[in-house]
Amino acid sequence: MAGAKEIRSKIGSVKSTQKITKAMEMVAASKMRRSQDAMEASRPYAETMRKVIGHVANASLEYRHPYLDEREAKRVGYIIISTDRGLCGGLNINVFKKAVTDMQAWKEKGAEVELAVIGSKATAFFKHGGAKVAAQVSGLGDSPSLEDLIGSVSVMLEKYDEGELDRLYLVFNKFVNTMVQQPTIDQLLPLPKSDSKDMQREHSWDYIYEPEPQALLDALLVRYVESQVYQGVVENLACEQAARMVAMKAATDNATNLIDDLELVYNKARQAAITQELSEIVGGAAAV
């Protein structure tokens, strides 16, 4: 059994670590609330944009934008969102597993796969795995802006425009609640048709365009893709803070249990030492 001094040292070390994890838990809780506010503020815009685009995809348009047309999927692109930092449980690895599974399914069909990665964890993971990474961005911080993402999104859109990609997907963690973060894959291009009930009844939509339909749709559809990627980033950020808060709370609780166990061992060691000293005193007295 370890000596009392060594055990006291371990207890002190665990208590120091516990203070750190508790502080990180509190910081993550504060950041999570701010991230949730940002996510909830941007959700209505992203969801409304998705509905409008779904209607456009179902409409009989006088100008047919290339983003609306299905084509044989020989080259598939993914925009994969991750965190820049760790200590957030299995958040990143879960979304990576989902992405890799989907990518593998396309590869088995003979398609080539190309990526744009957001977040240093995704960059490290997919580059280490030998994936073809066309664009990357990291260091977005706790308040990401659309301007930070436009470069990487533009790279993938240009590839789609030039026929170097036939499908484009967005991979991210969707915030459900504090305890649940759902790895999600959304199709960005070609534009998915609306799944609303009126669309299922084959409702026909008529549009009046001002200015010309080509200029309007060219701008609208690019803005749609950008808005979905931005929403994915803020959703993933809220997931990151929630997962980190939960992970740090678990670490703090584990530290408490470990301290209790070590204190029990310490008390046993101290009791054994006292018993040994008493035995030596009694033995010495008997010898005299």
Swiss-Prot record:
Keywords: ATP synthesis, Cell inner membrane, Cell membrane, CF(1), Hydrogen ion transport, Ion transport, Membrane, Transport
UniProt-annotated location(s): Cell inner membrane
SUPFAM superfamilies: ATP synthase (F1-ATPase), gamma subunit
GO terms for MF: ATP binding; proton-transporting ATP synthase activity, rotational mechanism
Record Pfam families: ATP-synt
Membrane topology category: Peripheral membrane protein
Cellular component GO terms held in the UniProt record: plasma membrane; proton-transporting ATP synthase complex
InterPro entries noted in UniProt: ATP_synth_F1_ATPase_gsu, ATP_synth_F1_gsu, ATP_synth_F1_gsu_CS
Origin superkingdom: Bacteria
Any GO BP annotation: proton motive force-driven plasma membrane ATP synthesis
Keyword Transport set for record: yes
Described purpose of this protein according to its UniProt entry: Produces ATP from ADP in the presence of a proton gradient across the membrane. The gamma chain is believed to be important in regulating ATPase activity and the flow of protons through the CF(0) complex.
UniProt similarity note: Belongs to the ATPase gamma chain family.
SUBUNIT field: F-type ATPases have 2 components, CF(1) - the catalytic core - and CF(0) - the membrane proton channel. CF(1) has five subunits: alpha(3), beta(3), gamma(1), delta(1), epsilon(1). CF(0) has three main subunits: a, b and c.
Protein name in UniProt: ATP synthase gamma chain
Source species: Vibrio vulnificus (strain YJ016)
Lineage: Bacteria, Pseudomonadati, Pseudomonadota, Gammaproteobacteria, Vibrionales
